[in-house]
């Protein structure tokens, strides 16, 4: 920061991330220049909402003069553009905080998401700018310099002027201003002079901001409808206006996947209009804490109280956008009172029940739509299994799984799985892995494939945290096929097995060579065509769970859990090794290398092989030995 103490005009330097942000906005979102107006109107609407809230909750020390409105003035000859609101305004400190810096999480989150889209070759999503709270800066796409004049709603405070070219700095100086609110003015660049024409501004307002709850004027003409759709009966709603309303409140360019209209009268009365987005918002993909901050808008008697109310829905449903309006809370309700209010708790309970019931109806009546919904939000929905025990059974019924008997992209419910279980099967089996292909190639499936037993395939990273917690469904326990505890004692081993003496001998060979690298070595009853496989002990972590924990705790240096190595004593390789051991060749380098290679091949299938170079080198040595004349 630099300033000149001899002048009332002070100059401030932007932080490095601000310069980077402004450069990204101007050069990455240039194909969507009209969004600058959407963002300026959105900010003005927020300022008006804050002003109305302050007026309703306090009678002292506030400038309450004038109507709450937004006015836009343009001149096509000069290219000038002015947008003014009568909202809460800003003090000097707020001006610096709001326009001179951006919360690093918002800035970095926006830049991260934008770069990710560019890297993946996706069409740039102009919706990003609103999701990450950096919308004001989109104005620098259409102008070279912006002037902001503002005065706080607090009586007796000085007005201020902020000016910047969006390069390396901005200036602030005192200004004479009578009315509260904020005025933003600039001259449009030559190539964007279309936005200085009233008809074009009107088009954009009706496209993006028609449902702003405060009047938007171009000169003396009001442009927007200000319709509270949620107050109207569902039978009167038209899909087109519902879609436009969703785009406005959700800051989205796409139509919603579906919407739910709720009207409740009773001990608690409220109306709601809730939406499922057509795809997961970018902020949920690139910001791990985004769900904690999201929620529908809360209105009391048609007055916006909270823009994103986290207390209306449980965290696993906060991908739902919308509006909830009740008359059972006071207008001056505080954040703390909202959290503690029994009214809010009841509304949350009712909305949760209605949403889960709605999802179930979609699943039964519109399976294709539910498939799209589950693809976008299934991972988030699963969070509720470990947090919402009241609705746990409803959530379990919404779960969908690929299996060893479905084609890719086809899903079954647990109810459907149980309905087609093999004769005599008493447990529900699942297998977790990084991909469908990786799981289907795993040796641990051989036993189940041979006996035509269906296995659930869990490739969603969150599955390893939530699915084991279900324990049982329809009185049938869920079991990981990776666990050694699966009872196969009644299963006759496949093929001609080694004698008891030969089995003991080859097991001792593996234990001697592998030593502390394994928890145990045992004869397998699950293998059919593979020589070895790795399984986890009864109380050991599932492999995928352990991997996820390591990824989440990279600095913790978590040791790997030792696995149990199962060997197939009917397999030719194991029988050959048993023969070598029987004639005293246990110390032969080729024999020992073969044992190590089998073990590390199992590690490779698990994705746990630490040194690929050593593995390849040893494989070359074995090939050389096998081809030696």
Swiss-Prot record:
Disulfide bond annotation, renumbered to this chain: none
InterPro entries: HATPase_C_sf (IPR036890), HSP90_C (IPR037196), Hsp90_fam (IPR001404), Hsp90_N (IPR020575), Ribosomal_Su5_D2-typ_SF (IPR020568)
GO molecular function: ATP binding; ATP hydrolysis activity; ATP-dependent protein folding chaperone; unfolded protein binding
Region (B): 336-547
Region C: start-end pairs: 548-629
SUPFAM superfamilies named in the record: ATPase domain of HSP90 chaperone/DNA topoisomerase II/histidine kinase (SSF55874), HSP90 C-terminal domain (SSF110942), Ribosomal protein S5 domain 2-like (SSF54211)
CDD domains attached to this UniProt entry: HATPase_Hsp90-like
Sequence similarity: Belongs to the heat shock protein 90 family.
Subunit structure of this chain's protein: Homodimer.
The protein's name: Chaperone protein HtpG
Phylogenetic lineage: Bacteria, Pseudomonadati, Chlorobiota, Chlorobiia, Chlorobiales
